[in-house]
Amino acid sequence: MSYTYKDNTDEVLSALEKAKKRGLEAIGLVAEGHAKKLTPVDTGRLRNSISHATDYEAAYIGTNVEYAPYVELGARGRDGKHMLQRAATEHTDEYKRLMEDSMKNA
């Protein structure tokens, strides 16, 4: 009696890596949306500048507007709005679900 085995390890690892990338992208998009909803608006420049990026391990949200740290963290007696921090930390269950869904569909 003879058995033949096929090693699918590379295909499985590739599918998992793609699923992780999809999950991180979904998390980044959703986190960006949450941050934009929390951002105070005067001209809309700060809100419109918020974007996301991903790498192999994480999703990031941020902005390149020079006055963003003052709105986020506060300055001169003004309380910070913490819109980026809150977008990242107040929705962890949702982000976990997004990653789980992505991995289930791998």
Tell me what each language-model feature is.
Residues 1-106:
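Short, Lys/Arg-rich flexible segments
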